[in-house]
A protein has these predicted regions:
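Flexible, glycine-rich loop/tail regions that form catalytic "lids" or insertion modules at the edges
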Residues: 1-436
Length: 437
């Protein structure tokens, strides 16, 4: 009891309403909840905790593995006698869908999207509310996005992301995006929220796709990586059907939330059987702004990767980024996604994708070299990740080099060994060199 040594300070603290009380007061004040509903929610939550405690005691659990939700349905001894009389194990305890140990995707689902959905998203960017006047540059951007959706222009990184969000929303999957300057994006490529040039009012095109679409939230967060990532991790657990995304202003800044990453993102499943599909977008690239604005510290996340605890990706094309986001929304079992996103590629014409890559195909963990016409003539294979590919390809073209193939490793963990082996097998006469980012 700290009041024994600091009575005055803790007397003051005791008079301050708790965080929960302040939060409830805010919800009630905004009309989002009544006081009775708040009390009922608290009572239900506490009752659930009590039930789980009694269930654990009755089962005689003594280790994390014994109380892991993923193992309970496979071990009748742990559930026998826990529920009410006459109930079977399946009736007495229902595992939340978000914590199911199954693998794979939703049956019949693919990450490709129909062209008509893409066109709808494009049109939504040019149908402004009456009297709404966007900045002239943003009007031009929205018109380009419509042309991209119609297949008349290659699709860039910013619009590929909005296409992923929009198609998910139309399918009924909510999307939450938070971070510093995420509405516009640090590198000014997203513009998920548009502003009237005269009065500043906001318009979010992805909220006006269909009448019954899911919820799309975009929040410019406070400058606290620790607090915001912790909140979003919890949000991903409480709203598992939502694609919850946290974006660092620069990937380097995630070190301010390292405790959350260590204690929850990379290890909660192993410790508590707690599954999350949280997405961390970490801008990475040495074309940044010097120290602490260049490296998302890829090596740090690879050191934390083990026992299939995360999905670590560095996509190099808008289309693969699109498929990555849509795959994450439905991938089972749920795993956190660490995605290293580019800077230069956001506006690099060579990195744009054709609309056909969005209406067909899937996420590619490895991208082979489609420019090679004679694999037997290749004497060297360069294996790389991310934007580095475009630098290498440009230099190869400058030299007129036809003996070097470049393979992109898009998925860093789990390492796609079979796909890497298949890509390398095409070049039996070549040595392999890893090109470090």
């Amino acid at each position: 009891d700290p009041s024994m040594t600091q009575p005055v300070m803790y007397s003051l603290i005791d008079r301050i309403p708790s965080t929960r009380a302040v939060y409830i007061r805010g919800l009630v004040g905004r009309g989002q909840l009544t006081e009775d509903e708040a009390r009922q929610s608290i009572a239900q939550y506490e009752a659930e905790l009590g039930r789980i405690l009694e269930e654990t005691r009755a089962g005689g659990a003594s280790s994390v593995s014994e109380i892991n939700p993923g193992s309970r349905t496979h071990d009748p001894a742990l559930t026998a006698g826990v529920g009410e009389a006459g109930e079977s194990p399946d009736e007495e305890w229902t595992m939340p869908e978000s914590q199911m140990p199954g693998i794979g995707m939703m049956i019949g689902w693919t990450s490709a999207a129909p062209a008509k959905q893409l066109r709808r998203i494009g049109r939504a960017h040019t149908r402004f509310p009456e009297g709404f006047e966007p900045h002239p540059k943003l009007r031009q951007l929205c018109e380009r996005r419509l042309e991209m959706a119609l297949g008349n222009k290659p699709i860039d990184w910013g619009f590929a992301e909005l296409l992923a969000f929009g198609t998910l929303l139309m399918e009924g999957t909510s999307v939450r995006l938070s971070g510093e300057d995420v509405a516009r994006a640090t590198f000014v490529q997203r513009h998920a929220v548009l502003h009237d040039a005269d009065d500043g009012r906001e318009f979010t095109p992805l909220r006006f796709l269909t009448e019954n679409q899911a919820r799309f939230d975009v929040w410019n967060s406070p400058l606290s990586e620790y607090g915001v990532l912790a909140f979003d991790y919890g949000y991903s657990l409480e709203s598992p059907e939502t694609l919850t995304i946290w974006e660092a202003q620069f990937g380097d800044f995630a070190n301010g939330a390292q405790t959350v990453i260590d204690e929850f993102v990379c290890s909660a499943e192993q410790k508590w059987g707690q599954r999350s599909s949280l997405v961390m977008l970490l801008p990475h690239g040495y074309e940044g702004q010097g120290p602490d604005h260049s490296s998302a510290r890829i090596e740090r996340y690879l050191q934390l990767a083990a026992q299939d605890n995360m999905w670590i990706v560095q996509p190099s094309t808008p289309a693969n980024y699109f498929h990555m986001l849509r795959t994450q929304a439905y991938k089972r079992p749920r795993k956190p996604l660490i995605a290293f996103t580019p800077k230069q590629l956001l506006r690099l014409s060579a990195a744009a994708s054709h609309i056909d890559e969005f209406t067909s195909g899937s996420f590619q963990p490895v991208i082979g070299d489609t420019t090679i016409t004679d694999p037997s003539a290749v004497t060297r294979v360069l294996l790389c990740t991310g934007r580095l590919y475009y630098d290498l390809a440009k230099e190869r073209e400058r030299r007129g080099d036809t003996s070097t193939a470049i393979i992109r490793l898009e998925q860093l963990y789990p390492l796609p060994e079979a796909e890497v082996a298949e890509a390398l097998a095409q070049y039996p006469n070549a040595s392999v060199t890893w090109v470090q980012d």
